[in-house]
Swiss-Prot record:
Self-association state and partner proteins as the record states: Tetramer of two alpha and two beta subunits.
Positions bound to Mg(2+): D450, D456, E459, E460
GO terms of biological process kind: phenylalanyl-tRNA aminoacylation
Single GO MF annotation: magnesium ion binding
Protein name as catalogued: Phenylalanine--tRNA ligase beta subunit
Lineage: Bacteria, Thermotogati, Thermotogota, Thermotogae, Thermotogales
InterPro entries attached to this UniProt entry: aa-tRNA-synth_II/BPL/LPL, B3/B4_tRNA-bd, DNA-bd_dom_put_sf, Fdx_antiC-bd, Fdx_antiC-bd_sf, NA-bd_OB-fold, Phe-tRNA-ligase_IIc_bsu, Phe-tRNA-ligase_IIc_bsu_bact
Subcellular location: Cytoplasm
Length: 788
């Protein structure tokens, strides 16, 4: 999220400079990654008027202009022959620097000296490409410094907004944080709109209330679609959005300012003069504003006029009903869409927009009228026209603020310090707080969907109060013996680890289908048949937990839950030498998105995702393992491995065979591992000693190799660890690519190597030397070559 400083200060009046603002935000949990200057312009760049224009005496491609700045007249040469007398332009004078780094100085063009330069928007950093001198649409005061007047000296906070804080995807949201931190009041918008009473044939209907709990529309007439003024262009570009026209720019401006995406339709392109919100059935095709046609999967929220699709709700508008130069009448949409439905639709169609980015995380369902008024006010200011008084607002089931009780004693117990007036901190964040004696009754505003429990409120108090103010104390915790044995404690430790890695624990039946075990024998074990099975597909004891987990995964798929991380610690059973045996194993299965809670992260689970979970477990337990490629029935041949400790197999890992997945109607790549808990506990008896935080920085190097498909990258990893010596701290794979630019039957594998010296800082020269030797050794030993 890019937040221009001047825009932020309109909402909260602060004495802090921008560096202090960045520091306070970061300390409170809103991380400022950088302070940017989006425009690389400086010096005397001023408004001027062309008072005379004539052809260059020695060049047909140039013209000579006399330009008045209010103080003196300059001679300027330009190649833009559309410049005319009377045009108000932007003049860069000697010493000025343009966005492309060009420094202005007097220059001779075939016998005529140009004393400056007439600027295009590209040269000011306001457009990516422009070959025309910018002309102000209306007269302006001469001699005004454009850099200062229009914010081309703007500084911008580049803020990393976590997925749980959609309220901060707006200027007002960040300003609210600063208001709470500083104690200064938040200046909320107070839209001033002139209304006209006029009857109009129009209606709004919601058929899909689940996908669209609230939809509002407002009508404007008589607008003029044209280029946006310079101040609007500059502010949008500073915020990372390109300018299109005054109406579209107004919608983007309001979205950035208030955090609620909005849309404008051309009223006269609505066939039935009505809005009907419905759910897609699947198979429909729609042409969107990105000029691409999409076939809908079913379940998407559609904005229609009863017959034609106008927009993909919460994601993108349609081409047919968009705003064009001849648009005169508008329908202004401000709605609330279900975050889950928007996320699923955007993912299924492969669309990512500023609108879906916000709706996926959750916008405020109860700021709709304010946002609509602000949009109407801004369009009226930029495009003229008038606003109809009637406001269509369909909101069948109002979403009420959550009520949470907060115990005062609990605040001090959790934070470890007494906070004066914690209720006031919450009020500054716009929570409604009632003092109930020994507790607070708190109404959580609907723009804060992340706050659900008492502990969330305490976190809000702590971060605004300042964790740096909390005195550090040594905590003494007495040992408690719960009577658990070593085995139970180890089992609990592994369970807690898997939950901490984002996996959900399941408990399943030990009875499975003998036909599945026979067809896909992941392990070479003889199953134990049941003499009296409870069902025909539960007639043997499982030889692997795989058969249980795949069933759970398939059931979730039927219910549209496709981002899954499952694990189970349980028994497997088999015959060995005529005897019945049972072994406790840890098994895990994962598919779908790698981080389903992070809507900015579209990566899917891969082999290295689930292997990374195992690697972290082995590291924590101090177990040194070796992965060896293996063909395992039921797993994909080139993406499976057995796991060994001291040449003894303790488990296996791999990608589930797509043919097997088809039998369960699972359409996502799925990964599985199974580890013998008894052997894991045995080899985990020696835990790693405590290692202090490194005093010296690490140095990372990456390398991409072209490898034959099926090549075991673990061989390179082991070679790097061995040849790099004690300076190599970590080696791993972080990217695999095959496709365009990669030869057939080859794959590009990118590895990273982390170097660190315990006693000093490594130089680039010595790291480069060691790294190059390692790479060359890998090339020689394995007959491979680097990609870059």
């Amino acid at each position: 999220m890019r937040v221009p400083e001047s825009w932020l200060r309109e909402f909260v009046d602060l004495d802090w400079d921008i560096e202090q603002i960045a520091e306070r935000l970061t300390f409170s949990g809103t991380s400022v990654e950088d302070i940017l200057r989006p425009f690389n312009v400086s010096g005397e760049i001023i408004t001027a008027r062309v008072i005379e224009r004539f052809d260059h005496p020695a060049s047909e491609k140039l013209i000579v202009c006399k330009v008045d700045t209010g103080k003196r007249i300059y001679t300027v040469i330009t190649a833009d022959k559309t410049v005319n007398e009377g045009d108000y332009v932007i003049l860069a004078l000697e010493g000025a620097t343009l966005n492309n780094g060009l420094k202005i100085e007097p220059r001779e063009f075939k016998g005529v000296i140009s004393e400056g330069m007439l600027c295009s928007l590209e040269e000011l950093g306001l457009e990516e490409k422009s070959d025309r001198v910018y002309r102000f649409p209306d007269p302006v005061e001469l001699g005004v410094n454009v850099v200062e007047e229009y914010g081309l000296n703007e500084r911008v906070l580049d803020i990393e907004i976590t997925p749980n804080r959609p309220d901060c995807l707006s200027i007002i949201g960040v300003a609210r944080e600063l208001s709470a931190l500083s104690g200064r009041p938040l200046n909320k918008p107070q839209p001033d709109v002139s209304f006209v009473d006029e009857d109009v044939q129009f209606d709004v209907e919601i058929e899909d209330v689940e996908g669209c709990p609230r939809y509002s529309a407002r009508i404007m007439k008589g607008v003029t679609v044209k280029d946006s003024p310079l101040w609007m262009k500059a502010r949008l570009v500073a915020a990372g959005v390109r300018s299109l026209n005054n109406v579209v720019d107004a919608t983007n401006y309001v979205m950035i300012e208030l955090g609620h995406p909005v849309h404008a339709f051309d009223l006269n392109r609505l066939k039935n003069k009505r809005i009907v919100v419905k759910s897609a059935k699947g198979g429909e095709r729609v042409l969107l504003l990105d000029e691409k046609e999409y076939e809908l999967k079913g379940g998407e929220v559609l904005i229609t006029d009863g017959e034609n699709v106008l927009a993909l709700g919460g994601i993108m508008g349609g081409m047919e009903s968009g705003v064009y130069d001849d648009t005169r009448d508008l329908v202004l949409e401000v709605a609330y869409f279900d975050p889950v439905r928007i996320r699923k639709a955007a993912k299924a169609l492969g669309i990512s927009s500023e609108s879906s980015y916000r709706f996926e995380r959750g916008v405020d369902p109860n700021d709709v009228e304010l946002v609509s008024l602000r949009l109407a006010e801004l369009i009226q200011k930029l495009a003229g026209g008038y606003v109809l008084r009637k406001f269509w607002d369909v909101y069948p089931r109002k979403i009420e603020p959550k009520k949470v009780m907060l115990r005062k004693a609990r605040i001090e117990k959790i934070l470890g310090t007494k906070v004066e007036e914690p209720g006031d901190i919450l009020r500054r964040l716009e929570f409604q707080v009632e003092d109930r004696g020994d507790s607070y009754e708190v109404l959580v505003p609907t723009f804060r969907p992340d706050v659900e429990r008492e502990i969330d409120l305490i976190e809000e108090i702590g971060r605004i109060y300042g964790y740096e103010k909390v005195e550090s104390k040594v905590i003494s915790v007495p040992a408690v013996n719960r009577g658990w044995g070593e085995k139970q404690l180890f089992r609990r430790e592994i369970s807690q680890f898997m939950k901490g890695m984002g996996f959900d624990e399941v408990v399943t039946f030990s009875f499975v289908d003998s036909q599945k075990v026979k067809k896909w024998p992941l392990v070479d074990r003889e199953p134990i048949a049941l003499s009296n099975p409870i069902a025909s597909d539960m007639d043997v004891m499982r030889t692997s937990q795989f058969y249980s987990l795949i069933q759970v995964l398939a059931e979730n798929f039927k219910r549209q839950n496709r981002d899954l991380k499952l694990f189970e610690i349980g028994k497997i059973y088999f015959k060995e030498n005529g005897n019945f045996r049972e072994i406790e194993t840890l098994s895990a299965m994962s598919c779908g998105l790698e981080n389903p809670g992070d809507y900015t992260d579209k990566r899917s689970v891969s082999f290295y995702t689930i292997k990374g979970v195992l690697d972290e477990l082995f590291f924590r337990l101090g177990v040194n393992v070796v992965y060896r490629a293996a063909e395992i029935p039921g797993l994909f041949p080139t993406r499976s491995a057995r796991i060994y400790v001291e040449n003894r197999e303790i488990g296996f890992i791999g990608m589930v065979d797509p043919k097997l997945l088809d039998e369960y109607d699972v359409k996502e790549d799925t990964y599985f591992f199974e580890i013998d808990m008894e052997l894991l506990r045995k080899y985990a008896s020696k835990r790693p000693a405590y290692r202090p935080t490194p005093r010296f920085p690490a140095v990372r190097r990456d390398i991409s190799f072209l490898l034959p498909k099926g090549f075991e990258s673990v061989k390179i990893i082991e070679l790097f660890k061995k040849s790099g010596g004690d300076l190599v701290e970590e080696v791993g794979v972080f990217d695999i690519y095959e496709g365009k630019g990669i030869p057939e039957n080859m794959v590009s594998v990118t590895l990273y190597v982390v170097f660190r010296h315990p006693e000093r800082t490594l130089t680039d020269e010595e790291v480069n030397k060691i790294f190059e030797e390692m790479v060359q050794k890998a090339e020689r030993e394995f007959g491979i070559r680097r990609r870059f």
